[in-house]
Every structure is written in structure tokens, then in C-alpha cells.
Amino acid sequence: MDQVLYSSYIIKIPVISRISPSQAQLTTRLNNTTYFGLSSSRGNFGKVFAKESRKVKLISPEGEEQEIEGNEDCCILESAENAGLELPYSCRSGTCGTCCGKLVSGKVDQSLGSFLEEEQIQKGYILTCIALPLEDCVVYTHKQSDLI
């Protein structure tokens, strides 16, 4: 095996057929883009960006309030579990309605879901297993029975 040094890492290339350094660099760039969503042409290669934290207040049917931290990369259900809270769920993919809550303030992205109808979304219903908080939010939990 030959070793080729690019910037600060070494790539081992089998000597089955000779690959020019420019071909190896292109292959590495394509693999990084394909497998990891990375691209040095974006100018952010190798940088890590922290997502802005959102406060999500969860209100149980009994009126108990819990505030958790969330961000737009982690659904409300997962953020609640990370904080040690238990919320109802089943599918974790936005297809069953078990985790339904009602958003009374704030904004979420739940574009990955397929269970709720547009009318239900307009009334504020969300699926906590897919809802990503885009702003600070207040959510009433355990609202599956409202959908029936």
C-alpha cells in the first residue's frame, strides 16, 4: 500500500492500479460528501456549530409543569427523555398519534410526520416524537384522546 498525505490525514491507497494524487483527492472529497454530508467547498469543513437552545415547557394532564432544554436537531420526546421525563410514545416516526401534544405557544417543525391532518395541525396539535422546537414552546402533553 502507498501512503498519500493530504492536509493533516493519511490515506492508504492499494497499489492495484496507480491512482494519481488528484484522483485520490477527488475520491476522498466525494466519499466525505456522500457518506458524511461534508464538503470542503462550503467553507465550513471541519467546523462544529452549536445549535441554539430552546426552552420547552411541558404541561401534564394534572397541570404539572416541567421545563426542558431542546434544539432544532432533537425532537421534544427525545429531549424530555434526556431530561428524565416519561411521555407516551409508540412509533417514534410520526405515524401513530400516541405522543400527541398541543402546542399553545412557540413554533415547531414537524414536517416529517404523516399522521396529523392539516386541520389538526392548525389547531396546534403536534407529535412530540418528530416535533423539533424552532422557538421556546409550551406544550400540553397526553392529547391523543383529543384526536379521536
From Swiss-Prot:
Binds 1 [2Fe-2S] cluster. Pfam families: Fer2 (PF00111). Residues 54-145 form the 2Fe-2S ferredoxin-type domain. Its cofactor is [2Fe-2S] cluster. [2Fe-2S] cluster binds at residues 91, 96, 99, 129. The keyword Transit peptide applies. GO terms for biological process: electron transport chain. The keyword Transit peptide applies. Expressed in leaves. Not detected in roots. One of its GO terms (molecular function) is metal ion binding. One of its GO terms (cellular component) is chloroplast. Its main location: plastid. Residues 1-49 form a transit peptide. Keywords: 2Fe-2S, Chloroplast, Electron transport, Iron, Iron-sulfur, Metal-binding, Plastid, Transit peptide, Transport. It is found in: Plastid, Chloroplast. Gene3D superfamilies: 3.10.20.30. Belongs to the 2Fe2S plant-type ferredoxin family. Ferredoxins are iron-sulfur proteins that transfer electrons in a wide variety of metabolic reactions. This is Probable ferredoxin-4, chloroplastic. The gene is FD4.
